C-alpha cells in the first residue's frame, strides 16, 4: 500500500559535493565576468535607447504641452486682466461723466428755479405794491370822507355846545372856520 519516504527505489541522495568546496556564485565567476560586462553594457545601451527614444520624448511632450497650456492660460489671464482694466477705466470715465452731467443739470435746475422764484417774487411785489397803492387810495378816500363827516359832526357839535352854553345860535361860517382851524392844527 503506502511506501515510506526513506526507501524509494532508484533514488540516491546528493548530500555531498565532490572536491570538498562549494561552487562560487555565478555572477562572481571570473570565467564569465567579461561576458557579463558585455551583457550589462548591451542592457544599458538598450535601456538608454528605449528611454531616450521612447519614454523621454513622451515625458518631454507632456511637459512641453503643460508649459504651452500654462503659457496660454497666463496669456489669456493677462488679456482678460487688460480687458477688465479697460472696462474699469471706461466705467470710471462714464461715472465721472455722469457725475459732471448730474452736477450740470443740478446747477441748471437751481438757476431756473432761482430765476422762476425771482420772477414770481417780482410779480408778487408788483401785485402787493398795486394793492397797497389801492389800499392807500381807499384809506385816503375813506379818511377824506371821514374827515368830511368829522368836520360836519364837529361843526354841528360846536354849534350845539355854543348854543347851549351861550344860549345864542352861532354863525355857521364862524363855526366852520373854527373847526377847520382846529382840525389843521
Swiss-Prot record:
It holds the Pfam family ATP-synt_B. It is found in: Cell inner membrane. It comes from the Bacteria. The chain crosses the membrane at residues 37-57. Keywords: ATP synthesis, Cell inner membrane, Cell membrane, CF(0), Hydrogen ion transport, Ion transport, Membrane, Transmembrane, Transmembrane helix, Transport. Residues 1-26 are annotated as: Disordered. InterPro entries: ATP_synth_b/b'su_bac/chlpt, ATP_synthase_B_chain. It is a single-pass membrane protein. CDD domains: ATP-synt_Fo_b. One of its GO terms (cellular component) is plasma membrane. One of its GO terms (molecular function) is proton-transporting ATPase activity, rotational mechanism. HAMAP family: ATP_synth_b_bprime. F-type ATPases have 2 components, F(1) - the catalytic core - and F(0) - the membrane proton channel. F(1) has five subunits: alpha(3), beta(3), gamma(1), delta(1), epsilon(1). F(0) has three main subunits: a(1), b(2) and c(10-14). The alpha and beta chains form an alternating ring which encloses part of the gamma chain. F(1) is attached to F(0) by a central stalk formed by the gamma and epsilon chains, while a peripheral stalk is formed by the delta and b chains. F(1)F(0) ATP synthase produces ATP from ADP in the presence of a proton or sodium gradient. F-type ATPases consist of two structural domains, F(1) containing the extramembraneous catalytic core and F(0) containing the membrane proton channel, linked together by a central stalk and a peripheral stalk. During catalysis, ATP synthesis in the catalytic domain of F(1) is coupled via a rotary mechanism of the central stalk subunits to proton translocation. Belongs to the ATPase B chain family. This is ATP synthase subunit b 2. It comes from Rhodopseudomonas palustris (strain TIE-1).
Amino acid at each position: 500500500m503506502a511506501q515510506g519516504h526513506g526507501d524509494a527505489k532508484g533514488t540516491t541522495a546528493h548530500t555531498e559535493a565532490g572536491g570538498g568546496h562549494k561552487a562560487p556564485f555565478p555572477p562572481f565567476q571570473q570565467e564569465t565576468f567579461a561576458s557579463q560586462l558585455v551583457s550589462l553594457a548591451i542592457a544599458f545601451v538598450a535601456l538608454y535607447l528605449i528611454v531616450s527614444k521612447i519614454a523621454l520624448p513622451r515625458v518631454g511632450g507632456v511637459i512641453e504641452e503643460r508649459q504651452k497650456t500654462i503659457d496660454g492660460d497666463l496669456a489669456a489671464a493677462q488679456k482678460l486682466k487688460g480687458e477688465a482694466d479697460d472696462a474699469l477705466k471706461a466705467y470710471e470715465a462714464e461715472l465721472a461723466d455722469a457725475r459732471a452731467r448730474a452736477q450740470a443739470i443740478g446747477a441748471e435746475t437751481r438757476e431756473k428755479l432761482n430765476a422762476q422764484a425771482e420772477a414770481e417774487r417780482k410779480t408778487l411785489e408788483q401785485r402787493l405794491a398795486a394793492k397797497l397803492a389801492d389800499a392807500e387810495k381807499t384809506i385816503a378816500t375813506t379818511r377824506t370822507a371821514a374827515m368830511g363827516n368829522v368836520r360836519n359832526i364837529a361843526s354841528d357839535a360846536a354849534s350845539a355846545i355854543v348854543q347851549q352854553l351861550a344860549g345864542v345860535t352861532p354863525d355857521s361860517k364862524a363855526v366852520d372856520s373854527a373847526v377847520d382851524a382846529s382840525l389843521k392844527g
